[in-house]
Amino acid sequence: MLNTRHWDRHKTGGLNFTELGFGTAPLGNLYKAISDAEARATLDQAWESGMRYFDTAPLYGLGLSETRLNGFLRDKPRDQYLLSSKVGRIMKPCAPEARTGLGKWFDVPQRQE
């Protein structure tokens, strides 16, 4: 069984992180839309299970995953978790029917730009 509470030092970067990470693409409504309450309950369960390494990206729900993760981690002690993300993809606002690639698989709420 993986130990989600054990922090280990990464051999090349010197960072400490848990053996298992939590990928947050589903919090950005990947394949299926979920409510904010469902996202929060999922994160609560992950935290209670010892999860402390979270991975996100701006592409996950066009920022929805990051927004939900931010709301959750805001009150957590900063030295208790590790957060990773990705950069480099330029996202341009477009209508849902104009989405291509991975973006068409996320059910993204409409936002005012």
Describe each region flagged by the PLM:
Residues 31, 99-113:
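Glycine/proline-rich, positively charged
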Residues 1-93, 97:
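N-terminal binding-site loop/beta-alpha segment at the start of enzyme catalytic domains
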